[in-house]
């Protein structure tokens, strides 16, 4: 039995008629549920980008800074045609700045048809495209879907199955299988690893991620992202138990040590 206030309480923050994220399809090809968007991103792909944050996610990461994206109707219903028109308004500036569109979440692959349509439109507008994903639902993205994705920002949260499950509530293998498939497709990838003291910072855990990633020729970068507390107020607002309230941000020395493990395994890391 899931307790109210648990990160697995699917009722928290949802509209009463919200569909389950796991099985929602509906008219996804014509509308979707968007949490928000922002312009001016310079860290989520090359150039200056527009970031679209979709609603819906099946992971329940202990350090999630956007728990308000977990459920579809926590976002705003938006017509795909309207989203494409808005993207078109930004396209000339994005092209001029060598940027493009990055779709994040939540988990974009929950809303497969909507994000497929948005990526396709971005390519027709001459924009670079990036998918920011945990890879947990990577099996849903067929090769045609990935053909419209220029770069995958793949969040590998742990190399150890038990640590991964503790951090996310889900299994590690789907993410690893998706990573292997992206490598087979020679799809450019930036691996992202969140360094959380006391959770993911064990050198053995980092080494497992590094050894898995190092042989993959498609991985352009491994990015070590320091844990932060910036999303804790959202957990509090939603009435969710936040288990990492006493977890510090990693020191520069801890980040450097993690980077050295990745570099020592042969990864390009930053």
PLM region spans:
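Structural preference for long, well-ordered alpha-helical segments within the folded cores
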Residues: 60-63, 114-117, 121, 261
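N-terminal [4Fe-4S]-dependent radical SAM core
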Residues: 1-53, 59-76, 89-97
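Short glycine-enriched, charge-decorated loop/helix-capping segments at active-site entrances
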Residues: 68-72, 165-171, 239-247
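Short cysteine/histidine-rich metal-coordination sites, predominantly Zn2+-binding motifs
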Residues: 75-85
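Short, conserved loop/turn and helix-capping segments at secondary-structure boundaries
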Residues: 77, 169-172, 249-252
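Auxiliary Fe-S-binding modules of radical SAM enzymes
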Residues: 1-41, 197-270
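Conserved AdoMet/S-adenosylmethionine-binding subsite of the radical SAM
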Residues: 88-100, 105, 109-236
């Amino acid at each position: 039995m899931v307790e109210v206030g648990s990160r697995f309480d699917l009722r928290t923050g949802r509209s009463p008629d919200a569909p389950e994220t796991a099985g929602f399809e509906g008219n996804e090809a014509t509308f979707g549920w968007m949490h928000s968007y922002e312009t001016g991103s310079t860290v989520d792909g090359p150039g200056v980008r527009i970031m679209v944050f979709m609603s819906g996610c099946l992971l329940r990461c202990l350090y999630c800074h956007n728990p308000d994206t977990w459920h579809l109707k926590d976002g705003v219903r938006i017509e795909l045609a309207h989203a494409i028109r808005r993207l078109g308004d930004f396209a000339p500036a994005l092209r001029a700045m060598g940027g493009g569109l990055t779709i994040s979440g939540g988990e974009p692959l929950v809303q497969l048809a909507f994000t497929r349509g948005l990526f396709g439109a971005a390519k027709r507008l001459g924009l670079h495209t990036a998918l920011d994903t945990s890879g947990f639902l990577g099996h849903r993205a067929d090769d045609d879907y990935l053909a419209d994705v220029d770069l995958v920002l793949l969040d590998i949260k742990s190399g150890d199955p038990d640590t991964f499950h503790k951090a996310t509530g889900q299994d590690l293998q789907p993410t690893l299988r998706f990573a292997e498939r992206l490598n087979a497709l020679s799809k450019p990838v930036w691996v992202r690893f969140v360094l959380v003291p006391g959770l993911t910072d064990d050198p053995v855990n980092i080494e497992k991620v590094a050894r898995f990633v190092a042989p993959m020729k498609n991985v352009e970068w491994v990015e070590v992202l320091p844990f932060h507390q910036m999303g804790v107020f959202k957990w509090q607002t939603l009435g969710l138990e936040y288990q990492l309230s006493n977890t510090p941000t990693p020191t520069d020395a801890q980040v450097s040590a993690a980077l050295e493990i990745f570099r020592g395994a042969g990864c390009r890391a930053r």
